[in-house]
Amino acid sequence: MVRFCSATLGLLLLAAAAQAQDDKLDTKMALSGERLFRTYCGACHGKAAKGDGPLAKDLKVAPADLTRLSEKNNGAFPFQMVTETIDHGRNVRGHGSQDMPAWGDAFKSTSQTPDEPKRMMRELAHYLWSLQPK
């Protein structure tokens, strides 16, 4: 029982530490996220993340302007919603018969470590956070 409680407490502390890291913008993560954004997101969302990428015109629904996420969330950056959308995709019908890609699956299939996909999604979210008007 003591081992179980110790293990559970350890996991809770790790989760709390990871959550605390996302309470404020991390510029180092944002810089890494910019590279990922250009690789995975820019074709649809555009270089400036305004939804005007070169593939946007081919979609039924225009990609979101990702520079307005905080504005649409009462001034707070919706970090968890962003990482969940990156991970699981989004039910948007702009991709014809497909929804927005679930990048979490793509990241998992190419990752060297189990933690890498989550880190990549967090880096992307920090980058998008850095694009929000102050």
Language model features with spans:
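Positively charged n-region of N-terminal signal peptides that target proteins for export
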Residues: 1-4
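Electrostatic cytochrome c docking/interface patches
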Residues: 18-36, 72-74
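Sequence context surrounding c-type heme c attachment/ligation sites in exported
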Residues: 31-39, 114-115, 133-134
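Bacterial N-terminal signal peptides
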Residues: 6-16
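Detector for the c-type heme attachment site
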Residues: 44-51, 105, 129, 133
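Extracytoplasmic electron-transfer domains, predominantly the class I c-type cytochrome c fold
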Residues: 58-124, 128
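The canonical Cys-X-X-Cys-His
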Residues: 33, 37-47, 100, 124, ...
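Short beta-strand/turn micro-motifs at beta-sheet edges
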Residues: 52-56
